[in-house]
Amino acid sequence: MSERSLLVVVLAAGEGTRMASRLPKVLHRIAGRSMLHHVLETTRQAGATRVAVVIGPDREDVAAEAHRVRPDAQVFVQTERLGTAHAVLAARAALEEPADDVLVLYADTPLLRPETLENLRAPLADGAAVAVLGFRPADPTGYGRLLTQGDALVAIREEKDATPDERRVDFCNAGVMALRAREALSILTRIGNANAKGEYYLTDAVEIARADGLSAVATEAEVDEVAGVNSRLQLAEAEAILQGRLRRAAMAGGATLVAPETVFLSVDTRLGRDVLVEPNVVFGPGVTVEDDVVIHAFSHLEGAHLERGVSIGPYARLRPGTRLGEGVRIGNFVETKAALIDAGAKVNHLSYVGDAHVGSNANVGAGTITCNYDGFSKHRTEIGAGAFIGTNSSLVAPVSVGAGAYIGSGSVITDDVPADALALGRGRQAVKEGWAAALRAARGKPKV
């Protein structure tokens, strides 16, 4: 990582009309994080000293996300959308503070790797004033071309202005630019708007720098890194690219994904060695899985920690605040939330365990419900170590079941149960012999 100080200006003022959404474009999520979050995290990994985020008018939600992810971010408002250079100059106060390098990124380009940004900055330390990121798409139609002579970047030519020879160039402009800070303001403030749209284009910085006798260069990125998101289709395409990266990283780290294309990970998902993930599993944000865990098909996890040797599913749902101790078994159609389940405990079938602590080696039978909400507040359930909860039982919180206690099947438990006690909370069974035969005789054969 460079020792040079770095100001990153993130442009997040676009309207995003093609998204057809009330949510600002840059707040749409990919792999569990907003696009803006992805970009800000990349700037952190790339060694940003300061970050300035340029937003549109009345976008307090975008400002809030920027400060949530990076509390020290400076936020500036571009009151009129008059082009990319105009947007960068909206952060003029940040540009006037000391820095070695300035990096301009777009909040709707969330897949850049930090090492790509470090490579883009490197020529600035060697004397270049401007460095532009390029890529080589399979079809360059529609992109601005990067025109080079040897190692020098001569110009960025928009396709509509390009000659036939220039259009044959396949090295295209990704829009990302690094500038040496001591020349940045001088260059940016001289960009004009003498074009058809009357806008100020950042791409003009290259020719202004060269006219000043300064050096401009281009570096290259992989095509998938510079994918911009302007529509729902492109959002899905970016999701697919990032999921591919995350799946490959998980498998390289020692996890088995039986059908990788059906497993969806969040950026912060952590899978240990010899974890087995069956098909159609979704990892929401905040999931950590230790070694030797088995996650059966069609399970959904979010905000959960699974210790070594856990088995969950199929069709399990782990919600935020779930922590499963070593060797815990969570079976099919079980939902947990804000639940601490200690080592060796079992919740095998058709149960809801919320706002609860289940002690080690306890057994929670099929159809057990912790009734944690009274319409106003949540309440906790405590199940002691080695307790046995019979099937189809309701534990009405706040309530405690002592260690080693038994709850009879079908019980509704409203009072605390002492350790090693048996609690029954159901009506007594009544048997009336011959009753069914008499009913059929009185009513005749049932109609189908």
From Swiss-Prot:
Named in its record, the pathway it takes part in is:
Nucleotide-sugar biosynthesis; UDP-N-acetyl-alpha-D-glucosamine biosynthesis; N-acetyl-alpha-D-glucosamine 1-phosphate from alpha-D-glucosamine 6-phosphate (route II): step 2/2; Nucleotide-sugar biosynthesis; UDP-N-acetyl-alpha-D-glucosamine biosynthesis; UDP-N-acetyl-alpha-D-glucosamine from N-acetyl-alpha-D-glucosamine 1-phosphate: step 1/1; Bacterial outer membrane biogenesis; LPS lipid A biosynthesis
Binding-site residues for UDP-N-acetyl-alpha-D-glucosamine, renumbered to this chain: 11-14, 25, 78, 83-84, 144, 158, 173, 230, 319, 337, 352, 363
Region (Pyrophosphorylase) residue spans: 1-232
Q: What class of enzyme is it?
A: transferase
GO function terms (MF aspect): glucosamine-1-phosphate N-acetyltransferase activity; magnesium ion binding; UDP-N-acetylglucosamine diphosphorylase activity
Q: Which residues form a coiled coil?
A: none
Supply the Gene3D superfamilies for this chain.
Hexapeptide repeat proteins, Spore Coat Polysaccharide Biosynthesis Protein SpsA, Chain A
Location comes to: Cytoplasm
**Residue numbers binding acetyl-CoA:** 366, 372-373, 409, 426
Q: Name one GO biological process term.
A: cell morphogenesis
Q: Which GO terms describe its cellular component?
A: cytoplasm; membrane
Requisite cofactors: Mg(2+)
Name of a matching Pfam family: NTP_transf_3
Which residues constitute the catalytic centre?
Answer: 349 (proton acceptor)
Q: What is its EC number?
A: 2.7.7.23, 2.3.1.157
Location of region: N-acetyltransferase: 254-448
What InterPro entries does the annotation carry? Bifunctional_GlmU, GlmU-like, GlmU_C_LbH, Hexapep, Hexapep_transf_CS, MobA-like_NTP_Trfase, Nucleotide-diphossugar_trans, Trimer_LpxA-like_sf
Q: Which UniProt keywords apply?
A: Acyltransferase, Cell shape, Cell wall biogenesis/degradation, Cytoplasm, Magnesium, Metal-binding, Multifunctional enzyme, Nucleotidyltransferase, Peptidoglycan synthesis, Repeat, Transferase
On cofactor binding, the record's note says: Binds 1 Mg(2+) ion per subunit.
Please explain the role this protein plays, according to its UniProt record.
Answer: Catalyzes the last two sequential reactions in the de novo biosynthetic pathway for UDP-N-acetylglucosamine (UDP-GlcNAc). The C-terminal domain catalyzes the transfer of acetyl group from acetyl coenzyme A to glucosamine-1-phosphate (GlcN-1-P) to produce N-acetylglucosamine-1-phosphate (GlcNAc-1-P), which is converted into UDP-GlcNAc by the transfer of uridine 5-monophosphate (from uridine 5-triphosphate), a reaction catalyzed by the N-terminal domain.
In which family does this protein belong, per the annotation? In the N-terminal section; belongs to the N-acetylglucosamine-1-phosphate uridyltransferase family. In the C-terminal section; belongs to the transferase hexapeptide repeat family.
* Assembly: Homotrimer.
Protein's name according to its UniProt entry: Bifunctional protein GlmU
Query: Which organism is this entry from?
Result: Azorhizobium caulinodans (strain ATCC 43989 / DSM 5975 / JCM 20966 / LMG 6465 / NBRC 14845 / NCIMB 13405 / ORS 571)
| Gene name linked to the record | glmU
